[in-house]
Every structure is written in C-alpha cells, then in structure tokens.
Amino acid sequence: MKIAIAGTIGRMGKMLIEAVLNTADAQLVGALEHTSCPQLGEDAGAFLGKKTGVLISSDVAQVLANAQFLIDFTRPEGTMAHLAIAEKTGTKMIIGTTGLSADQIAGLKKVSANLAIVFAPNMSVGVNATFKLLEIAAKMLSQGYDIEIIEAHHKHKVDAPSGTALKMGEVIAEALGEKLDDVAVYAREGHTGERKEGSIGFAIIRGGDIVGDHTVLFAGDGERIEISHKSSSRQSYAQGSLRAARFLQNQKNGLFDMQDVLGLRK
C-alpha cells in the first residue's frame, strides 16, 4: 500500500508515519504539511532518527500523484482541499478529521460517487466496538434511564464536543428512534430547571495531554451503568487507519466508516 500522510508534524501525523514505517504491507510515499511549515524539505522520518527518503512537502498534487491512499487527520478546511485534489488523482482517502460542517460532509458524499473514502470520527477498533455496545445498551435501557456523555481531551483540541462523543450520541439517538439534533443538550448553566426526559447531555473536559476519554452514563433510579473507552496513546488510531486502507483496496468508490471496515454494519 502506497500511503501519504497529511499533517505530518502533528501528534497524530507522527504516530501515523511511525506506524506505516513499521508495517510490512505499507510504504510511505508522501508527507504533507501547510506552506508555512518550518519543516518543509526535511525527511519525514527525522523525528524518529530515520531516513525515509520522503521529504515533507506542501505540493498536494505532486504527493497524491504517487499515492494510493491519503490518511488525513488535519482540520476541515485542509481535508476538503486535499479531497478536491484526491478526486482528480484517484487517491483513496482515510479521513479522521473532526469538526466538519454539514455542507462539508455533503461534499464528501458527493465526491464518494467517484472515490472510495473511509470517514470516521475515531479509527480505533475499541471505540467502534464501544459504539456497538452503546447501541445495544440504549435499546435495552430506553425507559427510565437518563443518558449523559462525558468526554475529555488534551488542551490543544480545537473542537467540542469531540467527533467521537457526537458519534456516540448519534448511535444512541438512532437506537432510540430519535435524531441527535432534537435531543442533545450541549451546555447547562444557571437555573436550568429539571432535566428534560429523553434528552442526551454532553459534558466536555479539556486539559493536559489527555489522548481521549469517553464515558456514557445511563442513570436510573437506584443504579447507573457506565460504558467507557479510554485511550492511552494514539497507536490504536494509527492501526485502525491502516486497517481502513486495507479495506479500501477492494473498493472502487463509496463513503464508508469503521463499522464497514470492521464488518459491524447491519
């Protein structure tokens, strides 16, 4: 698999490069960064003390012309710019970027008519297993339980709630026959009155170097159930991304997520 990485100097980008270099069936062929990045022209493996022969570049078209896959954990505007060029070069995309708008997601869907894309708020196998557990729990606990989603991330994360927390909310809402937009409560302050029955609450924590913690609380009378996933490193995201690339090898076009990759789709 000939793979290019976007956001090379970021925490996730470095983890992805290391994972690709240590994977037998993967080859690093490109490393992308923005035009003002001070590391442009440096070897992509320099942070590991390795010479890969792949130089960090801002020339998206040139990089994607040599890549079968682009793994992109950047920001929405960057991802959409990469997508426009990937459509022309036929480079399949694995997108872990969060915070995309409804219009941007619609753009992904449009391009996927011609290009195979995996788009998921979290590439971790464990997180996606958690989504399945939440679907089951929500159906079983649909009456008499209040649902709250608590998420914590590092102080540098720019979007809130996290894409993973929102996906958890969507999974639960769908299991209950609702739309998340109709039942979500993202903030509480002051005299809020009693909790609205059937709502799904969110609480957000930002601080330190927390990789990603998510807990869903089902609170009933006399008992509560908590389903949690805690990430200790970004390695699980990198390995999930490579698994997504392998899945896309057999796809010509279409928009997929990790439920498809893992065979969990109904």
From Swiss-Prot:
Protein keywords: Amino-acid biosynthesis, Cytoplasm, Diaminopimelate biosynthesis, Lysine biosynthesis, NAD, NADP, Oxidoreductase
Top-level division of the source organism's lineage: Bacteria
Pathway: Amino-acid biosynthesis; L-lysine biosynthesis via DAP pathway; (S)-tetrahydrodipicolinate from L-aspartate: step 4/4
EC number: 1.17.1.8
Locations listed in the record: Cytoplasm
Major localisation: cytoplasm
Heme as UniProt keyword: no
GO CC entries: cytosol
InterPro entries: DapB_C, DapB_N, DapB_N_CS, DHDPR_bac, NAD(P)-bd_dom_sf
Annotated residues for binding of NAD(+): G7, T8, I9, G10, R11, M12, E33, G96, T97, T98, A120, P121, N122, M123
BP terms from Gene Ontology: diaminopimelate biosynthetic process; lysine biosynthetic process via diaminopimelate
Residues in the signal sequence: none
Catalytic activities: (S)-2,3,4,5-tetrahydrodipicolinate + NAD(+) + H2O = (2S,4S)-4-hydroxy-2,3,4,5-tetrahydrodipicolinate + NADH + H(+); (S)-2,3,4,5-tetrahydrodipicolinate + NADP(+) + H2O = (2S,4S)-4-hydroxy-2,3,4,5-tetrahydrodipicolinate + NADPH + H(+)
Residues the record lists as binding (S)-2,3,4,5-tetrahydrodipicolinate: H154, G163, T164
Family statement: Belongs to the DapB family.
Stored NCBIfam families: dapB
Described function: Catalyzes the conversion of 4-hydroxy-tetrahydrodipicolinate (HTPA) to tetrahydrodipicolinate.
Protein name: 4-hydroxy-tetrahydrodipicolinate reductase
Organism of provenance: Polynucleobacter necessarius subsp. necessarius (strain STIR1)
Gene this protein is translated from: dapB
